[in-house]
Amino acid sequence: MLDKARSQSKHMDESNAAASLLSMETTANNHHYLHNKTSRATLMNSSQDGKKHAEDEVSDGANSRHPTISSASIESLKTTYDENPLLSIMKSTCAPNNTPVHTPSGSPSLKVQSGGDIKDDPKENDTTTTTNTTLQDRRDSDNAVHAAASPLAPSNTPSDPKSLCNGHVAQATDPQISGAIQPQYTATNEDVFPYSSTSTNSNTATTTIVAGAKKKIHLPPPQAPAVSSPGTTAAGSGAGTGSGIRSRTGSDLPLIITSANKNNGKTTNSPMSILSRNNSTNNNDNNSIQSSDSRESSNNNEIGGYLRGGTKRGGSPSNDSQVQHNVHDDQCAVGVAPRNFYFNKDREITDPNVKLDENESKINISFWLNSKYRDEAYSLNESSSNNASSNTDTPTNSRHANTSSSITSRNNFQHFRFNQIPSQPPTSASSFTSTNNNNPQRNNINRGEDPFATSSRPSTGFFYGDLPNRNNRNSPFHTNEQYIPPPPPKYINSKLDGLRSRLLLGPNSASSSTKLDDDLGTAAAVLSNMRSSPYRTHDKPISNVNDMNNTNALGVPASRPHSSSFPSKGVLRPILLRIHNSEQQPIFESNNSTAVFDEDQDQNQDLSPYHLNLNSKKVLDPTFESRTRQVTWNKNGKRIDRRLSAPEQQQQLEVPPLKKSRRSVGNARVASQTNSDYNSLGESSTSSAPSSPSLKASSGLAYTADYPNATSPDFAKSKGKNVKPKAKSKAKQSSKKRPNNTTSKSKANNSQESNNATSSTSQGTRSRTGCWICRLRKKKCTEERPHCFNCERLKLDCHYDAFKPDFVSDPKKKQMKLEEIKKKTKEAKRRAMKKK
């Protein structure tokens, strides 16, 4: 069983070593290890022999030393794990058996520290060499899962196969030294170090590995105060615990790292151990990136990680830098992580199908909704007040390195304030790994160029590492900084967003004056209030509640009720319902149910207000005169006075009892068209009758012999040739019973004419004295005898008959007459055009 486990672990080690070699060959920093193949073969044999010897030595409880590994700046690599993160699940990189043994000895990052103990104790040197191999391949495999490094990032890795160890140069590629160090056993400890960023700008930190740990190693709290200087090393030569640099947010990284024992070979590949490997990997992912604050540290803000592990009994330091340490100092070891290490929490690390350009080119404009209320809301001064030093430290996005346009990130919208948007969309997290600080045009703003021509625009995003300074300088009073507009959004959500983004985000001048901001804010507010805008607000407060004449319920001025800029609901005038007399039932009950209501009946009903005597006017409502005169306009634009409907007036009137008159024999037409009680209106109706001869004739036909008859056959012939024979016979019958006293009738008519003219104009009644052609055409008649002006212009026969002609009463003849009128009208227009 042990042999089977060894063969499996051997096979896994070889495959992992091959994968790590392929990933290392792609980097620019590790291109120089290929020439040293002899040392690689020697190291392979030494590590395999050391494995066999270690199993015998561990059971005897031999003392193990603590070799110190010196690590230069370990640059993280972006491999296929970033494109397909499922590889990190299929192949765990924190497992003990995944340790490759084929690490080339010429790799630059990890070297055996040379000292006086190298030749004295070969076991200790073998442990150091094997642990060097372990850390190198672990670093290549583990860092590839989480790192998304940029090729623009500066590297502190030495180009020659040398490594600084506490200020000394260690030559590990010498064939004599590598030959002298023959391995006899491997280290039983295969711990994984936390990924904490350590600043190694000038000095290189040392890494001490505990060689005999059998338990879970927890990160203790730092035992030294946090140092924010970028040049501080993670471990000093005089202190065993060292001092690490904590992050600005104060969040330590509590990583739990599983260490397996080589003596228990049967449980190495057991399900529990596999679960512990995956859990440790997940803990590295989840705990290392606890919040967005831990990602907001810049490249100069590092996090110090600490390892504490138990050693075997009698463990002692392995080099001269730890000879001074006591037994308690041996319990703690300081781990060094890559300097430019970065955990990408953006969407491309969780979803392999999402590409970088699709994720970062969208812009969220939902925070522009209330941008018109405050000055700082639309002036866009969220991060434009960063000084020149923060701008020089702000990395340029690698995707827009040439176009220098900033990119928004979905995960950074939590930095928006409630009603405020920043001047720049926050750049994506992957852009912080590129530190292109050699941009000479970063602070040079060409004020005359187009804001959308972003080829020479520099990119300024959020400087996450400088959180306290950013918060202090972020007040809306710091508006005199240089403003760089972001690029236009790739996706326009509505038809107003293009104009809105030009007004808010792209001024032609880079100034942020108060007047310009006020103008832009006013323009944005106007755009938001348009009816086609999706940002239109309907809850505008009423400025003055008492002044309801100027504003309605929505605060819209009533002077422009139907303007396109304001809603027209609630500002319409109330509709006045008017019931015309022709559509009303008669006031008095009619004996003839088949009576036709026409304009003649309107005439009879219009006379009702004037039947009152002087005493009857006292009973009227005082508001009657004002309510009867309704000022309206006809379709030609003329102003006319209209009275209210007749039933409303009749309810307010008290009609006095009038003198009854005898019915005439020839009153058949009047009895058939009007109500039976109409004749009770007798004298007052005749006294206010209109003055036209046709209506005089009708009054003579209808009423008593007090008024002489004027409808002689000669008068009928002169006034209308188309009079019915029936009407002529009626006129003859009535003339037999009435005396021919025309002089008395003319005097009475002249006196009534003047009274009727004044009363009709004062009350605003329509005239019924026009000819039948004008009444049929609904035109104003000039009432000229024998032909009015309209009939003479159209060359039509003018009819002033007392009763309706057949082309008015008969519908078929009426239609024919209307067609004739149309033809005559066209002919008259042609003649008028010819005269012009």
Swiss-Prot record:
SMART domains: GAL4 (SM00066). It is found in: Nucleus. GO terms for biological process: cellular response to nitrogen starvation; chromatin remodeling; lipid droplet organization; meiotic cell cycle; mitotic cell cycle; negative regulation of inositol biosynthetic process; negative regulation of transcription by RNA polymerase II; positive regulation of phosphatidylcholine biosynthetic process. Changing L527P: Impairs SIN3-binding and gene repression activity. Residues 1-77, 92-168, 218-332, 381-464, 636-766 are annotated as: Disordered. Residues 508-594 are annotated as: SIN3-binding. Residues 1-14, 117-126 have a biased composition (Basic and acidic residues). Its main location: nucleus. Changing T103A: Impairs meiotic genes expression and sporulation, reduces interaction with IME, and reduces phosphorylation. One of its GO terms (molecular function) is DNA-binding transcription factor binding. CDD domains: GAL4. PROSITE patterns: ZN2_CY6_FUNGAL_1 (PS00463), ZN2_CY6_FUNGAL_2 (PS50048). The keyword GTP-binding does not apply. Component of the RPD3C(L) histone deacetylase complex (HDAC) responsible for the deacetylation of lysine residues on the N-terminal part of the core histones (H2A, H2B, H3 and H4). Histone deacetylation gives a tag for epigenetic repression and plays an important role in transcriptional regulation, cell cycle progression and developmental events. This is Transcriptional regulatory protein UME6. It comes from Saccharomyces cerevisiae (strain ATCC 204508 / S288c).
